[in-house]
Amino acid sequence: MSASASLPVTRAAAAPRITVLFSTEKPNANTNPYLTQLYDALPDAVQPRFFSMREALLSRYDVLHLHWPEYLLRHPSKMGTLAKQACAALLLMKLQLTGTPVVRTLHNLAPHEDRGWRERALLRWIDQLTRRWIRINATTPVRPPFTDTILHGHYRDWFATMEQGTTVPGRLLHFGLIRPYKGVEVLLDVMRDVQDPRLSLRIVGNPATPQMRTLVETACAQDARISALLAYVEEPVLAREVSACELVVLPYKQMHNSGTLLLALSLARPVLAPWSESNAAIAEEVGPGWVFLYEGEFDAALLSGMLDQVRAAPRGPAPDLSQRDWPRIGQLHYRTYLEALGKDGDAAL
């Protein structure tokens, strides 16, 4: 056998096997597709295990990988929250005593809601124990001691086999969990002031609060151009809803990392979003005609002119998402885990 032919066997044998405990539950039909695709993309040398507090406290693993750590500290009831926070403190003591490295993915610069001083203190402790950070866009500020850039993967493969909807001319779409920071209330107010009869607005997603549900239902009752599907929707339904629109509208009050934006691009739909450094980087990455950015107020004048602008913009058949392919993302995560353990990360590549 030639030396080149034997190289893959040598590399595979040299790749250290490691066990990674993820802070999320075992994937199911309702799991965020980002997580499901990440777990599927990990190389065979990574043995994934999924979170329970019992597993985290009593078992052995090489690395703890945290996504959205605030959710480990929260419960609908006050007593449940106290219990989860007490268990989390025990876990952090264990990690500190055993020297188990923590890897943390920065999905947000900070939690969207502030849940009090105990949560803030525990999150600071987690920060202190984090040995490597993963930022999913290159504009996120780096954090000590080490930060790795692994771009958020696309959803193109995830939706490839799902039926696409027929485009409804003039339809605008806002989708995802309906939360106050996403600007839905502003979008509804602006839509009432838009005079263009070609435009309609579709809201798809589960309201985070009863107040948000009432807000959307009232707008639908008052304006026949506005319709909504207010529920958690399965992915085939979501694929049809997204592909049926001409433009996805995301008037977020704050926007740094957005899986919603990438999901829309994965289904080849143009997006209107506020200017931010991260959104500008994505707009440049994917090519012209896919991401339209605005600065200042989101208002009727802006929304009224968007349909003609989107239709006139030159664009390719699909946005360029080649930097976000999952096999490479899995290998880069493996490298981060090895380096968190003080091993040679090049063994992963």
From Swiss-Prot:
This is GDP-mannose:glycolipid 4-beta-D-mannosyltransferase. SUPFAM superfamilies: UDP-Glycosyltransferase/glycogen phosphorylase (SSF53756). It is found in: Cell inner membrane. Its main location: membrane. It comes from the Bacteria. Keywords: Carbohydrate metabolism, Cell inner membrane, Cell membrane, Glycosyltransferase, Membrane, Signal, Transferase. Belongs to the glycosyltransferase 94 family. One of its GO terms (cellular component) is plasma membrane. Gene3D superfamilies: Glycogen Phosphorylase B. Residues 1-14 form the signal peptide. It holds the Pfam family Glyco_trans_1_4. It comes from Xanthomonas campestris pv. campestris (strain ATCC 33913 / DSM 3586 / NCPPB 528 / LMG 568 / P 25). GO terms for molecular function: glycosyltransferase activity. It is an enzyme of class 2 (transferase). It catalyses: beta-D-GlcA-(1->2)-alpha-D-Man-(1->3)-beta-D-Glc-(1->4)-alpha-D-Glc-di-trans,octa-cis-undecaprenyl diphosphate + GDP-alpha-D-mannose = beta-D-Man-(1->4)-beta-D-GlcA-(1->2)-alpha-D-Man-(1->3)-beta-D-Glc-(1->4)-alpha-D-Glc-di-trans,octa-cis-undecaprenyl diphosphate + GDP + H(+). The gene is gumI. Its EC number is 2.4.1.251. Pathway: Glycan biosynthesis; xanthan biosynthesis. Nonprocessive beta-mannosyltransferase that catalyzes the transfer of a mannose residue from GDP-mannose to glucuronic acid-beta-1,2-mannose-alpha-1,3-glucose-beta-1,4-glucose-PP-polyisoprenyl to form the lipid-linked pentasaccharide repeating unit of xanthan, Man-GlcA-Man-Glc(2)-PP-Pol. Is involved in the biosynthesis of the exopolysaccharide xanthan.
